């Protein structure tokens, strides 16, 4: 899950970024509306977490711009403006959810997951594939009664492959889905994660297509 965080307050932004990353999400952090516009024009996101009180372009103006370009990416507004009138105004402008400051990070994470599930037409975070049951929130895979623990990166990679089953994904595409702007990436990071998943889940789950990328085949 790739999230665009738009927040100008360094302290709040850092805390939210850390919390979302710890929950297994990939986060790009824009500190103003213009920077967020550029990000949205160049990168596909599963969710936008948006503060309304931004420099250069207000959060309300950015939200209006997002919807006018027919971008249906879910938007969660977080703001200190938490009167009923403010909430109604934000939702009417196109926000999908509204969270007043201060807030609990666990609630923010839960709301983020719920918005993405809803946008993808899913009622639960868990993903079934063959005899596997993947739980991105708990970073686990169940095979029958066996519980297999994954790192947050391994889980995010597996979810990306399962969401695109039958379609090969390049190493660059997988890197984009797993790493934010400011994160350093080892040149062989994807290969290492793929190797770990094969060791934990079986060598046949993920197929390498030389010169193209990796794929999890559709179930037959």
Where are these regions (language model features)?
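Positively charged, aromatic-enriched patches within helix-turn-helix-type DNA-binding elements
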Residues: 95, 140-205, 210-212
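N-terminal/domain-start alpha-helical segments
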Residues: 1-123
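CheY-like receiver
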Residues: 119-138
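Glycine-rich nucleotide-binding loop
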Residues: 35, 211-215
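A general structural signal marking secondary-structure boundaries and capping sites
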Residues: 70, 119-123, 165, 182, ...
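Conserved hydrophobic "DFG−1" position in protein kinase catalytic cores
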Residues: 100, 134-136, 141-143, 216-218
């Amino acid at each position: 899950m790739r999230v665009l965080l738009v927040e100008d307050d360094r302290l709040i932004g850092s805390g939210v970024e850390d919390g979302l990353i710890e929950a297994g999400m990939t986060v790009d952090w824009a500190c103003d509306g213009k920077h967020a516009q550029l990000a949205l024009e160049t990168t596909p996101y599963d969710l936008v977490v948006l503060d309304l009180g931004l420099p250069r372009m207000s959060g309300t103006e950015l939200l209006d711009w997002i919807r006018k370009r027919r971008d249906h990416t879910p938007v969660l507004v977080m703001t200190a403006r938490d009167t009923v009138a403010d909430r109604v105004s934000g939702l009417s402008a196109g926000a999908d959810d509204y969270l007043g400051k201060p807030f609990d990070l666990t609630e923010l994470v839960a709301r983020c997951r719920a918005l993405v599930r809803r946008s993808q037409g899913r009622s639960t975070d868990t993903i079934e594939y063959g005899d596997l049951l993947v739980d991105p929130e708990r970073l686990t895979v169940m095979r029958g009664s066996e519980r297999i623990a994954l790192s947050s990166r391994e889980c995010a990679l597996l979810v990306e492959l399962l969401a695109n089953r039958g379609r090969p994904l390049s190493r660059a595409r997988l890197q984009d889905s797993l790493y934010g702007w400011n994160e350093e990436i080892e040149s062989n990071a994807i290969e290492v994660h793929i190797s770990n998943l094969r060791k934990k889940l079986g060598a046949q789950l993920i197929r390498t297509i030389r010169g193209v990328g990796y794929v999890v085949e559709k179930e037959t």
